[in-house]
Amino acid sequence: MGAEIDSRIEDEQKLVDDMLKVLPEKAARNRRKHIVVRNCSTEQHIEADDKVIPGILTNRGCAFAGTKGVVFGPIKDMVHLVHGPIGCAFYTWGTRRNFAKAEEGGDNFMNYCVCTDMKETDIVFGGEKKLKKAIDEVVKIFHPEAITICATCPVGLIGDDIESVAREAEKEHGIKVIPARCEGYRGVSQSAGHHIASNALMEHLIGTEEIKSPTPFDINVFGEYNIGGDLWEVKPIFEKIGYRIVSSLTGDGSFHRISQAHQAKLSILVCHRSINYTNRMMEEKYGVPWLKVNYIGTKGTEKLLRKMAEFFDDPELTRKTEEVIAEEKAKYAEDIEKYRKKLKGKTAFIYAGGSRSHHYINLFEELGMKVIAAGYQFAHRDDYEGRQIIPQIKEKALGSILEDVHYERDENVKPTVSPERIEELKTKIGLMDYKGLFPDAEDGTIVIDDLNHHETEVLVKTLKPDIFCSGIKDKYWAQKPWSPSRQIHSYDYSGRYTGFSGVLNFARDIDMALHSPTWKFIRPPWKAENVE
């Protein structure tokens, strides 16, 4: 078995080396640092969060996409005002499938796209007056209690003072107006926008309201964007056990609830990359501990629920947890097993953002499938190697323009968990830690950061995965000539994929993709070509 693993690692490394030969020497040297063929017997490192090589077709987004599209966009009762050209404003609920329902007596502005529509004359003479007028119109039409201003590239280039416009609008209209300097060039990917949005949430929202009736089991759900209704799949499970979700950040989120997030007893973190900044700052200022979790897959959901029960250490809560786990597993086990038999032995290639690639490795394995390549669009090294690597990460030039905010503990805060218990839980359940993707990628798996179209073509054609899971930008690039594909960013209008029932939904969708009769009418290139 050892010789077989060594042979696989050697073959995959040769594939990577051959794939990079077409690039100029300097570019090839750069990309080689972003690709690792897993060898679990040795310590490995990967380069990430670096600027894209000019001329390479990347799948990344910009800082504006990270702030407006990912973090701010799903907050339903705020009007998100794009200050910039109309082309930037398309990044809305229609592209992300963030679902939301209005709170009782509340608002839901998710379906609206509001933009200042800057023109050439605004670039020349400035856009501040146009921004003020847009805010006035938003207040007149929608009567929101809060507005965000999301700046695009031209705004930063001409120097519009969106902060002063926001302050004046707050005084004039008596509402919250939150400016975000999220111009697209502020960082190497959408990850910079996540950071900017997290800072804004802490500065302007979190800690500004109080929970009227606290309960012993109040929690936050961080890094959940309710794609296709994912949050709504797991929320009833939490409530059945006895938890109350104070705030979801930010899927189906309300700015009032986000303002109360500091009073939760525990924050669970789904997408590590997009919002771990807020978790860290909340723990520093308000003492709210966080727990990295994965509720995609039966095993992941079980593990999460048991860790949460361990954190609260309440006998009745623990009993209810086991009861709900047994009940939910029994509902879907038989149907899941039918699909597992059909999918066993199939291979998958995953390329996504946030923590999704990691989570779906676990889910594919649960279905008997093997992940042969995986990677992230906008990860940092700790998303691959774990948070223990953070002290060793050197700050890059573009990273220096992002404000890394730290807080002192609020003297009025009384910790709900003692420091001794926190240390104990760090060992028991991995509280406030994340081990990264590497530990769950087996020997020979190609782990690749910032996958580009050339690499997609070579890897998919050579590895011949049974399915390619990524986003809309590269879905058809892989699907047309080679492999069936599924989006795991917006689920191809399907889902939900979280919790116990999500496993069944996902297995059904993968089975349809792999065994659709339409594939009988297509001859893959590697079957048509004379391969020696």
UniProtKB/Swiss-Prot annotation:
UniProt cofactor(s): [8Fe-7S] cluster; [7Fe-Mo-9S-C-homocitryl] cluster
Binding-site residues for [7Fe-Mo-9S-C-homocitryl] cluster, renumbered to this chain: C271, H489
EC number of this enzyme: 1.18.6.1
Binding site for [8Fe-7S] cluster: C62, C88, C153
GO biological process: nitrogen fixation
ATP-binding among keywords: yes
Cofactor: how bound: Binds 1 [8Fe-7S] cluster per heterodimer.
Highest taxon of source: Archaea
InterPro entries: Nase/OxRdtase_comp1, Nase_comp1_asu, Nase_comp1_CS, Nase_Mo-Fe_asu
Reactions it catalyzes: N2 + 8 reduced [2Fe-2S]-[ferredoxin] + 16 ATP + 16 H2O = H2 + 8 oxidized [2Fe-2S]-[ferredoxin] + 2 NH4(+) + 16 ADP + 16 phosphate + 6 H(+)
CDD domains referenced in this protein's UniProt entry, alphabetically: Nitrogenase_MoFe_alpha (cd01976)
MF annotations from Gene Ontology: ATP binding; iron-sulfur cluster binding; metal ion binding; nitrogenase activity
Subunit structure: Tetramer of two alpha and two beta chains. Forms complex with the iron protein (nitrogenase component 2).
Protein task: This molybdenum-iron protein is part of the nitrogenase complex that catalyzes the key enzymatic reactions in nitrogen fixation.
Similarity annotation: Belongs to the NifD/NifK/NifE/NifN family.
Protein name: Nitrogenase molybdenum-iron protein alpha chain
